[in-house]
From Swiss-Prot:
This is Kelch repeat and BTB domain-containing protein 6. Kelch repeats lie at residues 386-435, 436-484, 486-523, 524-564, 567-616, 642-673. Residues 10-27 have a biased composition (Basic residues). It holds the Pfam family BACK. One of its GO terms (molecular function) is ubiquitin-like ligase-substrate adaptor activity. Residues 63-138 form the BTB domain. It comes from the Eukaryota. It is found in: Cytoplasm; Nucleus. It comes from Homo sapiens (Human).
Length: 674
């Protein structure tokens, strides 16, 4: 018989089903995750340690090695001394790590002498080892590159290369190409070649003794440039002209290379209009002496016997065999240079994620440029765009209300993201002036506060700064450039910004009830105000005048005015069906003060109805066809089509502060092309 003490225990041990009791699974409690010693990290420790080591270096405390930097040609004991810490130099610089830890002779010496670096550059690099900061300028960048290349300081070397690439211009591009070639920096060499190709026409006319020109390149460097498909030239004459320039700069030394140089000229792309130029080319002494057979063979292959005989009255029959042999490559019909297919086109900008359309309004040719925002994460945060175009036809795109800034290089058909802007805005505008991007106007997307701050971006430095603020806030306005000044204009006021004095000046206002669009043409501001009224501002006279009204067509919902080459175009659209735009293009006749319908062959354009336009020089051979954006009126919109919700909101009027509902069109910001 069980006792009372045993009974409960036996009942507890018994399984409910009569079998063995399952084993108890022991799971860790919450406290088990927090056992053991606490581990803390001082986030300021590394910076404080580096700062303390720098203070020791400055005070020459605890230094265990002295680096003597001797000027080339000088003897030991005449150089500049740098007391340093071995551990710091070895930790920051692979060159010194090998020196001090690899069993080299210098690892046991209290003093080390260096000959292949200048003292100023070494001082900057030692400071970098202690601080992680480096100061670059036009005066020291090439010497710093050479020193950092020797000391294997990769960050400084690449920073110097990036600095040089951002400062490429007509006066230094050939020197930078030679510099990159000397150090074997492929990326910088490619960037210099691309700049030369893009500006080849201008460079072909440069010959100042104070500048390095294409004639200063080595043979290998010149051949690499002349073989580029990406040369931005309208005629092969320019390429031939540069080849002759290079040969004539040193005829005795370079003359024997004439045949090799002229092989880079694509003779198949000369036309009958080039006959006078070719006749003059054949009379040049260096051509007669070194490569007459090469050019004669090329001309005979290009023009045939009839025209060839008119160009070369007395052909050198003895050289015909060598000509045909030396010009085998010319018979392969090489492609045209990139610049030969360049066209000034009207660019349509619509929804931020849609491709941008490049259109020739006269021929109806249509191409598309991918938007850089298509694959951007959180694209719903981008509602509109602000776009401007530089004199070099680079397209700068600012997303709203985000802080993104992008640049499109037409010759490379590629987008590059630049440094983020300082402020988030919506309703802003953007303009390019003398190497700077200006962004102003609009309001804070969160608080709705109108912004007077003006952001300025330095293209060469890839940096932003705030300049003189606006005297008054701007919404629903245009920002334009005339000569060296910015003009901000809306229906009630206009201000002019002078960058040389960093100040805003008040101008004669438009004083109209409405403001639609404005652009610069012949150094005057053409403005569509109360439709169909159009007025023109002359900045020299500081006065407005009214011109003939724009054409007024019923159901037109979009008016855009742009400078297209040497013409002023008015582009209007009406929307007979959802997201289908019937586009009409008018050209302004200055003498008759009237708008002429050019009868564009564009049909229905399936594109955002609130598009805006700019004009730029692009390269159709680099672009994809855009015919898929043309449609017929009777077609039914695809079920897969999606209408993007830009989010309706009301916007306080810039002038009165009253609240009014705005259409989507008010969110699109435009800048007239230069």
């Amino acid at each position: 018989m069980q006792s009372r003490e045993d009974a409960p225990r036996s009942r507890r041990l018994a399984s409910p089903r009569g079998g063995k009791r399952p084993k108890k699974i022991h799971k860790p409690t919450v406290s088990a995750f927090f056992t053991g010693p606490e581990e803390l990290k001082d986030t300021a420790h590394s910076a404080a340690l580096l700062a303390q080591l720098k203070s020791f270096y400055d005070a020459r405390l605890l230094c265990d090695v002295t680096i003597e930097v001797v000027t080339p040609g000088s003897g030991p004991g005449t150089g500049r001394l740098f007391p340093c810490n071995r551990n710091v130099l070895a930790a920051a610089c692979p060159y010194f790590k090998s020196m001090f830890t690899g069993g080299m002779y210098e690892s046991q010496q209290a003093s080390v002498t260096m000959h292949d670096v200048d003292a100023e550059s070494f001082e900057v690099l030692v400071d970098y080892c202690y601080t992680g900061r480096v100061s670059l300028s036009e005066a020291n960048v090439e010497r710093l590159y050479a020193a950092s290349d020797m000391l294997q300081l990769e960050y400084v070397r690449e920073a110097c290369a990036s600095f040089l690439a951002r400062r490429l211009d007509l006066t230094n591009c050939t020197a930078i190409l030679k510099f990159a070639d000397a150090f074997g920096h492929r990326k910088l060499r490619s960037q210099a070649q691309s700049y030369i190709a893009q500006n080849f026409k201008q460079l072909s006319h440069m010959g100042s003794i104070r500048e390095e020109t294409l004639a200063d390149l080595t043979l290998a460097q010149l051949l690499a440039v002349l073989r580029l498909d990406s040369l931005d030239v309208e005629s092969e004459q320019t390429v031939c002209h540069v080849a002759v320039q290079w040969l004539e700069a040193a005829p005795k030394e370079r003359g024997p290379s004439a045949a090799e140089v002229f092989k880079c000229v694509r003779w198949m792309h000369f036309t009958e209009e080039d006959q006078d130029y070719l006749e003059g080319l054949l009379t040049k002494p260096i051509v007669k002496k070194y490569c007459l057979d090469v050019i004669e063979g090329a001309l005979q292959m290009r023009y045939g016997d009839l025209l060839y005989k008119s160009l070369v009255p007395v052909p050198n029959s003895s050289s015909s065999s060598s000509s045909s042999n030396s010009l085998v490559s010319a018979a392969e019909n090489p492609p045209q240079r990139l610049g030969m297919c360049a066209k000034e086109m009207v660019i349509f900008f619509g929804h931020p994620r849609d491709p941008f359309l490049c259109c020739d309004p006269y021929s109806g040719d249509l191409y598309k440029v991918p938007s850089p925002l298509t694959c951007l994460a959180h694209t719903r945060t981008v509602t509109t765009l602000a776009v401007c175009i530089s004199p070099d036809h680079d397209i700068y795109l600012a997303a709203q209300p985000r802080t993104d800034l992008w640049v499109y290089k037409p010759a490379q058909n590629s987008w590059q993201q630049l440094a983020d802007r300082l402020l988030c805005r919506e309703g802003m505008d953007v303009a390019y002036l003398n190497g700077y991007i200006y962004i102003l106007g609009g309001r804070d997307p969160i608080t709705g506060v109108k912004l007077k701050e003006v952001e300025c971006y330095n293209v060469k430095r890839n940096q932003w700064a705030l300049v003189a603020p606006l005297p008054h806030s701007f919404l629903s306005f245009d920002l334009m450039v005339i000569r060296d000044y910015l003009y901000a204009l809306n229906s009630k006021r206009m201000f002019c910004y002078d960058p040389s004095h960093n100040m805003w000046l008040k101008c004669v206002s438009l004083k109209r009830n409405d403001f639609q669009e404005a652009c610069v043409f012949n150094e005057e501001i053409y403005c569509i105000c109360d439709i169909p009224v159009m007025k023109v501002y002359n900045p020299v006279r500081a006065e407005w005048r009214q011109m003939n009204n724009i054409p007024l067509v019923s159901e037109t919902n979009n008016y855009r005015i742009i400078k297209h080459g040497q013409k002023l175009l008015l582009i209007t659209s009406r929307t007979p069906q959802w997201k289908k735009n019937r586009v009409t293009v008018y050209e302004y006749d200055i003498r008759g003060d009237q708008w002429i319908n050019i009868g564009t062959t564009l049909g229905l354009l399936q594109f955002d109805s609130n598009f805006f336009c700019l004009s730029a020089r692009v390269y159709p051979s680099c672009l994809e066809p855009g015919q898929s954006f043309l449609t017929e009126e009777e077609e039914i919109p695809s079920e897969s089509s999606t209408e993007w919700d830009l989010g309706g909101f009301s916007e306080p009027d810039s002038e009165s502060g009253s609240s009014s509902s705005l259409s989507d069109d008010d969110f699109w910001v435009r800048v007239a092309p230069q």
